[in-house]
Amino acid sequence: MAHSHSHTSSHLPEDNNARRLLYAFGVTAGFMLVEVVGGFLSGSLALLADAGHMLTDTAALLFALLAVQFSRRPPTIRHTFGWLRLTTLAAFVNAIALVVITILIVWEAIERFRTPRPVEGGMMMAIAVAGLLANILSFWLLHHGSEEKNLNVRAAALHVLGDLLGSVGAIIAALIIIWTGWTPADPILSILVSLLVLRSAWRLLKDSVNELLEGAPVSLDIAELKRRMCREIPEVRNVHHVHVWMVGEKPVMTLHVQVIPPHDHDALLDQIQHYLMDHYQIEHTTIQMEYQPCHRPDCHLNEGVSGHSHHHH
């Protein structure tokens, strides 16, 4: 049997990605503060709800920026994977904060149905339009230019695109108030925008908890991966003890592979590593090659479960 380890590295244009993220973060964070101040001055709850939605974008951009920065830090003896998991922890805290903010906004909206308050429609309209333009600018900053963007930049662009709906909601509420003076439009739209925030927060919470619990990437079908390896690599007879987890946005894998004793061990190992890289974008793999079938009870234990503890035979 043999135990081998591979860690290939890819070089993305990190400075370009960091610059995009920094500019978009500045625009989004700045207009989020404008919406918070404008929401209090105009009395508009829809603007405050949209500011909450913009907070999800600001946080997504910040985490993406931190991921780019922390990915440059080399691992240490104490932190052998570096500091990438820190962004996941921050995302988890942010998701909980967003849920709390959303509950407070919905509670305030219900109170406003009972006791309506005046809303300054003109100011609300001006700030909502400015917020919409800020979102468009942020999306353009993230999306234009080089096509080689990392996953964080793409995810941040989708966050900003989703926030356009929140700004449109605030504009609709402002138009209704200006034309009809019907102020309940404001809490109604604020609840609708809050549902968008809650959806983003729930997705963020689910993804961050999955990563903190060292769950496998949602997009990866481990059973299918094992079948394909046995089918497409002639020397591979069986794949077991497969464990996959995420560190930042990078998947890490350990696995045991039963193989036909090869004429060239290193060539077969290299073939398996390249197969996982090319088909599943897994750069960091630890492969234990075995020449005898594994008949122990734990050979197929926890096959659907991700983690990085595994037994050596």
From Swiss-Prot:
<dbReference type="Pfam" id="PF01545">
    <property type="entry name" value="Cation_efflux"/>
</dbReference>
<feature type="topological domain" description="Periplasmic">
    <location>
        <begin position="111"/>
        <end position="121"/>
    </location>
</feature>
<feature type="transmembrane region" description="Helical">
    <location>
        <begin position="182"/>
        <end position="202"/>
    </location>
</feature>
<keyword id="KW-0472">Membrane</keyword>
<feature type="transmembrane region" description="Helical">
    <location>
        <begin position="21"/>
        <end position="41"/>
    </location>
</feature>
<feature type="topological domain" description="Cytoplasmic">
    <location>
        <begin position="203"/>
        <end position="313"/>
    </location>
</feature>
<dbReference type="InterPro" id="IPR027469">
    <property type="entry name" value="Cation_efflux_TMD_sf"/>
</dbReference>
<feature type="topological domain" description="Cytoplasmic">
    <location>
        <begin position="143"/>
        <end position="159"/>
    </location>
</feature>
<keyword id="KW-0406">Ion transport</keyword>
<dbReference type="InterPro" id="IPR002524">
    <property type="entry name" value="Cation_efflux"/>
</dbReference>
<dbReference type="GO" id="GO:0005886">
    <property type="term" value="C:plasma membrane"/>
</dbReference>
<feature type="transmembrane region" description="Helical">
    <location>
        <begin position="160"/>
        <end position="180"/>
    </location>
</feature>
<comment type="function">
    <text>Involved in zinc efflux across the cytoplasmic membrane, thus reducing zinc accumulation in the cytoplasm and rendering bacteria more resistant to zinc. It may contribute to zinc homeostasis at low concentrations of zinc.</text>
</comment>
<dbReference type="InterPro" id="IPR036837">
    <property type="entry name" value="Cation_efflux_CTD_sf"/>
</dbReference>
<feature type="transmembrane region" description="Helical">
    <location>
        <begin position="90"/>
        <end position="110"/>
    </location>
</feature>
<dbReference type="InterPro" id="IPR050681">
    <property type="entry name" value="CDF/SLC30A"/>
</dbReference>
<keyword id="KW-0864">Zinc transport</keyword>
<protein>
    <recommendedName>
        <fullName>Zinc transporter ZitB</fullName>
    </recommendedName>
</protein>
<comment type="similarity">
    <text>Belongs to the cation diffusion facilitator (CDF) transporter (TC 2.A.4) family. SLC30A subfamily.</text>
</comment>
<feature type="transmembrane region" description="Helical">
    <location>
        <begin position="122"/>
        <end position="142"/>
    </location>
</feature>
<keyword id="KW-1003">Cell membrane</keyword>
<feature type="topological domain" description="Cytoplasmic">
    <location>
        <begin position="1"/>
        <end position="20"/>
    </location>
</feature>
<dbReference type="InterPro" id="IPR023500">
    <property type="entry name" value="Zn_transptr_ZitB"/>
</dbReference>
<feature type="topological domain" description="Periplasmic">
    <location>
        <begin position="42"/>
        <end position="47"/>
    </location>
</feature>
<dbReference type="GO" id="GO:0005385">
    <property type="term" value="F:zinc ion transmembrane transporter activity"/>
</dbReference>
<keyword id="KW-0812">Transmembrane</keyword>
<feature type="topological domain" description="Periplasmic">
    <location>
        <position position="181"/>
    </location>
</feature>
<keyword id="KW-0997">Cell inner membrane</keyword>
<feature type="transmembrane region" description="Helical">
    <location>
        <begin position="48"/>
        <end position="68"/>
    </location>
</feature>
<keyword id="KW-0813">Transport</keyword>
<keyword id="KW-0862">Zinc</keyword>
<keyword id="KW-1133">Transmembrane helix</keyword>
<feature type="topological domain" description="Cytoplasmic">
    <location>
        <begin position="69"/>
        <end position="89"/>
    </location>
</feature>
